[in-house]
């Protein structure tokens, strides 16, 4: 699901959907999401709670997945045996072991009626039989000392196995496959407090194992049933190319990670979908710019792998669509302040007819409209800025706001002139704790004196104090 604020938002919404489904649906209605995107929401994501639970595969196991585990959403265990996994998927067996487990395994020819040594090891390996069951002199020795024929068709054997030879629950199931774990102190404490048996639910594998369909495609398909691969990107062209790792001038912003691999997996696995999330706008050099663009001189995910795209304004289902349909869908989730120029670019390229008009329901994609829809929920302490808490001090939160303000101001000439005027003002006394945190409360030289004045002014002018 990615890391950062978009990843946290995804985890939070997933929890809300499960824990307070009525509130979740109401939020979708109040923001207009159901009216405008109800079909794709229902067919790609659904609206119900997670009765069977989720399984996760991710390069990084961190706070988000741990929250899903602790709230009972991450609970679908997968197994590294295709036959066993298939029976679980079909409902032929459950994770609770009983007489029907043996019957189903035999009927599916995963084991034979007459136990071979391999059958016995398989049954013990996955916790179906008690670990003390073993073959001895051609007989099946059970924990209570009974010795029976190793044949499920023998009524006495079957009865004896059911009485003392069965395990209680399938073993060696996995909830998360990941390559490494990284998170907050809360996350590490949660791992540390777990017994070893519980930690084994989180399996660390090679990156290649997590990110690729290498060894056993049939097993991967069974484990990744109805998979949804969520990733974050920076920009999206109107033809469906995603920009995630580099800028058009060659500057590398971040490593591509497993994003391309997961998108490719979404197209290779049956019933799987790739979902790319991005903010519709960003600020650059003090100017607001659209993250949905007509074209861009770099691409991380090519247009032929386009699938589902999500912005704060809605969902665009692009898979299998024509260029015209793709452009129209992406215009519907773009910020309305940039829709006219994007629409004009598409028309100039003759990708949309000259008389095409963005539907009225999608022409009010503004922060104000979105905030109005969410306002009743924010007033009820839903959708908080930090849904899972934080490790910042109050001063660090104030400084975060002030420094962002300072960065935005310094991006333009007018802003720089305003900051220069701020040098004439001494920092307000309320800024002292923040300046102490920055080591600027007692400037030692001219540079620190300037920094202290700028930070003090930013704290006041940004409303952080």
What are the roles of these predicted feature ranges?
Residues 1-465:
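Conserved alpha/beta enzyme-core scaffold
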């Amino acid at each position: 699901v990615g890391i950062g604020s978009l990843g946290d938002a995804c985890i939070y919404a997933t929890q809300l959907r499960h824990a307070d489904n009525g509130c979740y649906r109401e939020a979708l209605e109040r923001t207009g999401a159901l009216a405008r995107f109800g079909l794709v929401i229902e067919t790609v994501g659904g609206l119900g709670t997670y009765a069977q639970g989720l399984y996760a595969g991710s390069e990084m196991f961190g706070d988000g997945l741990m929250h899903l585990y602790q709230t009972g959403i991450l609970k679908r265990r997968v197994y590294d045996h295709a036959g066993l996994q298939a029976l679980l998927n079909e409902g032929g067996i459950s994770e609770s072991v009983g007489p029907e487990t043996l019957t189903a395994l035999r009927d599916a020819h995963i084991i034979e009626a007459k136990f071979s040594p391999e059958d016995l090891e398989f049954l013990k390996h996955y916790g179906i039989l008690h670990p003390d069951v073993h073959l001895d002199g051609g007989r099946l020795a059970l924990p209570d000392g009974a010795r029976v024929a190793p044949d499920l068709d023998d009524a006495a054997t079957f009865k004896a196995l059911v009485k003392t030879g069965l395990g209680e629950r399938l073993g060696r199931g996995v909830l998360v496959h990941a390559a490494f774990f990284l998170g907050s102190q809360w996350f590490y404490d949660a791992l540390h407090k777990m017994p070893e048996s519980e930690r084994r639910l989180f399996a660390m594998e090679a990156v290649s194992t997590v990110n690729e369909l290498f060894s056993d495609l049939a097993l991967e398909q069974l484990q990744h049933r109805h998979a949804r691969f969520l990733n974050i990107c920076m920009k999206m062209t109107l033809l469906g190319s995603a920009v995630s790792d580099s800028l058009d001038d060659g500057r590398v912003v971040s490593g591509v990670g497993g994003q391309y691999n997961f998108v490719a997996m979404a197209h290779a696995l049956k019933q799987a979908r790739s979902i790319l999330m991005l903010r519709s706008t960003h600020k650059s050099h003090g100017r607001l710019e659209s993250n949905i663009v007509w074209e861009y001189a770099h691409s991380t995910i090519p247009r032929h792998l386009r699938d589902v795209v999500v912005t704060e304004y809605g969902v665009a289902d692009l898979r299998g669509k024509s260029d015209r349909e793709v452009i129209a869908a992406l215009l519907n989730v773009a910020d309305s302040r940039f829709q006219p120029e994007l629409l004009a670019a598409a028309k100039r390229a003759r990708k949309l007819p000259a008389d095409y008009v963005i539907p009225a329901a999608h022409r009010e994609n503004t922060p104000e409209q979105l905030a109005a829809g969410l306002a009743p929920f924010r007033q009820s302490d839903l959708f908080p800025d930090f849904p899972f808490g934080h490790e910042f001090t109050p001063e660090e939160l104030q400084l975060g706001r002030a420094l962002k303000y300072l960065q935005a101001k310094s991006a333009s000439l007018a802003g720089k002139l305003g900051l220069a005027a701020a040098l004439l003002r001494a920092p307000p006394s309320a800024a002292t704790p923040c300046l102490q945190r920055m080591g600027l409360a007692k400037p030692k030289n001219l540079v620190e004196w300037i920094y202290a004045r700028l930070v003090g002014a930013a704290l006041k002018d940004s409303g952080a104090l």
